[in-house]
Amino acid sequence: MVQQESRLRVADNTGAKEVLTIRVLGGTKRRYASVGDKIVVSIKDTAPNGSVKKGSVSTAVVVRTKKEVRRADGSYIRFDDNACVLLNAAGEMRGTRVFGPVARELREKQFMKIVSLAPEVL
């Protein structure tokens, strides 16, 4: 469960390490984002030779949350951290690799590129 001002780890190789959530996309009164939801983020911490700059604004999709996500079969899935993957203006991945596991809910929300590049889909 990610909301405004939440800080997330970046799970791709764009060079960003940490981002701050500016807005949860999907309506004016939308407060929380879960796995598969799009958010607007500001890059707060970067690697020295990354493709993104500190302070730049980007869109991202949440791939892991500490708050559990309930599935249709009654099971729950939760992760050890909150993480996202940066997207370009067209809604495609900016990076070429994904680090760490991602949730199966991304497949249902049509983020096939992220699912195919992830080392593990839970």
From Swiss-Prot:
Domain of life: Bacteria
UniProt cross-references to InterPro entries, sorted A to Z: Ribosomal_uL14 (IPR000218), Ribosomal_uL14_bac-type (IPR005745), Ribosomal_uL14_CS (IPR019972), Ribosomal_uL14_sf (IPR036853)
Database matches in SUPFAM superfamilies: Ribosomal protein L14
Coiled coil residues, start to end: none
Family in the record: Belongs to the universal ribosomal protein uL14 family.
HAMAP family assigned: Ribosomal_uL14 (MF_01367)
Summary of subunit composition and partner proteins: Part of the 50S ribosomal subunit. Forms a cluster with proteins L3 and L19. In the 70S ribosome, L14 and L19 interact and together make contacts with the 16S rRNA in bridges B5 and B8.
UniProt-recorded name of the protein: Large ribosomal subunit protein uL14
Species per Swiss-Prot/TrEMBL record: Flavobacterium psychrophilum (strain ATCC 49511 / DSM 21280 / CIP 103535 / JIP02/86)
Gene that encodes the chain: rplN
